[in-house]
Amino acid sequence: MKILPITGRSSKTPWKLIIDSFKGSASLLDDIILGAKFAKEALNLILVQDGRWKTRWGTAVYGQALPDGTQFMACGIYEKTDGTQEKIAIGKNGKGYRCVDQGAWTEVTGATFTTTATKYNFLQSVNQLYNSNGVDRLTRYDGSNFVRYTQIAAPTGLSGVRNVLTAGAYHNYYKITALNQVGETQGSAEYDLTTNKARNSWITTSNEYLTISWSAVVGASRYQIYYSDESGKEMLLAETSTTDVTFKDDGTYIQNPFSTCPEDDTTGAPAFAMIADSGSRLWGITGDDKIFWSGTGLDLGIFSDFHGGGWQPILGGTGEKFEHICHFRSGKGDGVATAITRNKAGIGSIWQIPLEATAIADTTIIVPNPSKLPGPIGTVAALGVVSANDSLYIPNSRGIFSLNNKANVTNILSTGELSGNIRPFYRGLQNIENIAGVWYDSKIFFTASESGNGNDVMFGLDTEQNEWFLKWTIGFKSFLEVTESNGTTKLLGIPENGTQLIEISKNIKGDLGQPFYQSWLSGLIPISNDSTVFAKVQEALVELGRPTGTIFFEILGLGQKGEFSSIATKQIADNLNAIEFWTGDLGEITLKDEEDAPVTYSQASVPKAKKIGKSLRAIQFHIYSSSADTDFTILKVQAKGVIDKLKTPSKFFK
């Protein structure tokens, strides 16, 4: 913005306002405080070219409809070994479908999904596309079918026999778990066999031992034995290498103090709310207070500690629940699994869980070392957390926050709110737990709900300009980035209620073939910092980049009597006469044709001016359109005139 300075007290002092650089949206500030660069309104616009406002991207249906009128619930990407990408869709009927590019959808068999599940998370690892939704057990797509982990039962029928030892006052509590290739069952019912000696006093050379037996479990590959001399505090004691259903405890086995008896069954894999890949392991959260990790290499996706996996309750008693998990980094830059929680206030906390190797006797075990980051920054929107530019962008009930390294400080992760300028808009959103986000074209796009009836708007952060743009009058359940066989990358939206995916592209005009209203409104810009100064505004000018369609340029302002009103409007038309609307001092409207013939604008820069002839204390600019095929970039807005009055108006004293 450039304002010619006022010098002296002459009423003929020239005045000029030029806005040729722009900032983003700022719903936080009132019109008169915004200044010239922030936008009071930027409806259906996007920031481009060093911060210029431009018509937003349009939408069109993409590909074919799901069979039988099935509506979309979720969609993920599976990449084959030849680089071809398949879209894997989950319908609201619980069935899965696949297609390549924009071809026909075919059903995927092997498993169906609970129709009440609404949030899906997809993750591809080692030629398997894992799918979690918080309701169904972990399911994977192997390139042909869905495969769901099959749960096995916990052992039953525990019994025991003493050898040399006799019954006595010393308790020996046992629980047995069964393992398959995926995980471990919950512990069996606790079994207590008393002895006349404490376990650490048994004499092996005297054949003092206990034999514990249990019933075989169908599908088990081996068993683990947990022991304690106190009820309910069993820790891992030993494991069988076969399917034998007996264990001889002679007192020489050492308990593992880091491995307690499981409370959850992982043989079918838990019903993970979300999964992530970090440190060559799969990580999962169950939507309560537990976090799971799998083994590595051939044991990837196996959550039993026998295969390098494990689990840990972290949030017990805090009132928080896990909402999101991802791979991020510590303050030192080391990659680490990072979990984000939620609480009733709509915020929460951030935890990082590095794994450390610890030797117990001749066995090396993996021990988690969770740490909580400072600050009450959590999320309620699992699909809304976005990783971009070495930062996490985290939406919660208070706003959108970032997690990244603090400038000029090493080994420190810092959090801070990014959404201050748009706080009133953001806090007016409904059902923020359904916010979804994606990083695409150096912009972070979010979709959310204003009405409370599904996501119906979009807004975003231009990470190059570090400015917000809002809002777009379209919304989606979530986003999907896909690369077609020809190498073209597209951004797709998964509709709230629809049978086809929606493409979102700068090369498309309109929404699904229909025009949308777009509007840029500046702040109410004072003529001077001195509120008593008025200017006789002689003319206003807008310079548009490659405009098409019908566009209106409106000038508004505060007049001598303190009234705020629309002063004049200019219509800029493609293939139409340019028509001016002028509002006189008495409120009358006159029309005037300025061109003798239709004009088609194809220039990179098209300036259009409008005569004003009004005395104003503050001025505001409005550029808008609702015609089909409209497209424009705002390059510059300006006005000029002369200082009209320097005397304080009498109205100000009333």
Predicted regions and their residues:
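Beta-sheet repeat architectures centered on beta-propellers
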Residues: 1-106, 112-128, 376-391, 395-654
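Disordered, low-complexity "stalk" and linker segments at domain junctions of extracellular
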Residues: 2-15, 20-25, 29, 64-67, ...
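Beta-propeller and closely related beta-sheet repeat lectin domains
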Residues: 73, 120, 273, 280, ...
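Hydrophobic core segments of beta-strands in well-ordered, beta-rich domains
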Residues: 89-91, 276-286, 326-327, 333-343, ...
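Predominantly extracellular/luminal cell-surface or secreted proteins
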Residues: 98-99, 177-181, 226-230, 292-305, ...
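Beta-propeller fold detector
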Residues: 106-110, 148-151, 236-238, 303-308, ...
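Beta-propeller domains
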Residues: 324-357, 375-401
